[in-house]
Amino acid sequence: ITTYLDKPGWLACLTGDFLTQFYYYRYAGPTILTLSILMAGYNVRCGVEDADIKGTWIPYTIAIAVMTMLVCFSLHYDYRLSSIIAIAGGANVFRFSTKILVSTRMFVKKLENQALRHTSIDGTRLPQWITAVSIFISMLVCHWFFGCGMWIYAALVLLGCIKYINKPGNYTRLAAITIPLFIIILDKRLYFIDFHTLYTYPGLGKFVKPQMDLEKTLAADCEYYFGNYNKVVNMIEKDKEPNSYMKFYYNLISAQGRSLPAVLLKYPDNNLGTFETLGPDTPPLTIKTLNELYWILGDMTFCERAAMLANVCSPENRNIRMMKRLAEINLVKGDY
């Protein structure tokens, strides 16, 4: 667990990875993803309202826009649940810090009244400095806990500054947002990551089209892993143009049933069967599929190599499936 501290946004990553493991169960993945997006939208709406923009359509519009954006980002297979948690966390830090700030300013006002200082609290510079210090600390804490979620926090603070643009102290608040961004640069030597990753971890996401071809590949891969071979065969035979990964699993199942020669030329560019080319540019997905081939062949040396490469080639990979395969290999080899 301590390895999560090697990157910013450790709480978002830890929470996201913990919830991601439940994707293993049917219908759990869509449920967790939907609830996470709704939670992010709810926190953003409440954050906008805490910025004193209430009773209008703006908070709901911004929340819907953020949730729509997260849905579009989630179409990319590499967009992690941790990124959604980071956005929700950034908005939550703003809500929490705002409530503490209001309570602190009320406490200061009581102290002034007790001291018989009749000057209004809004007429002194003390509240401005309290607000600036609160924003400064919250930005750094938000980056440590939620990484890129600090941009949501900064956006909500900026929204509040726009709301009260004519009030004194706006420049102080803007400085309190900007200064931590430069201080975070010093964390580069702490985390040993580039500047882009430092400010965007665990990931901002990008707009992509639905990757239906990859979805079919992962569906075939998962069904094969769970031993639903007939379902994999039916899935591939119904597809008019199965991709190379789908044909690989089709050939692998046929080979186990001793019927590979009969189906080898059923699809174009399928004459190599279960043979694949390995090299420096081999995709991680190919390495994972070859892991299943080596396991069926009983070659534990290459199977172990493929399982380890599948983890090494993917940064921050905590793939329980490959860890389980390494444990299975140790049981077969007697290394326990």
Stretches with model-predicted labels:
Residues 109-110, 123, 131-144:
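Membrane-interface alpha helices of multi-pass inner-membrane proteins
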Residues 1-19, 23-35:
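Membrane-interface coil-to-helix junctions
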Residues 48-68, 123:
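Transmembrane-helix signature of polytopic, membrane-embedded enzymes
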Residues 52-53, 101-126:
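Membrane-interfacial, low-structure loops and terminal tails that flank and connect transmembrane helices
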Residues 198-336:
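Soluble catalytic regions of membrane-associated enzymes that act on cell-envelope
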Residues 139-215:
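Hydrophobic helices that insert into or interface with lipid environments
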Residues 34-52, 89-99:
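Transmembrane-helix motifs of polytopic, lipid-linked glycan transferases
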Residues 66-84, 143:
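Aromatic- and kink-enriched transmembrane "portal" helix at the membrane-lumen/periplasm boundary
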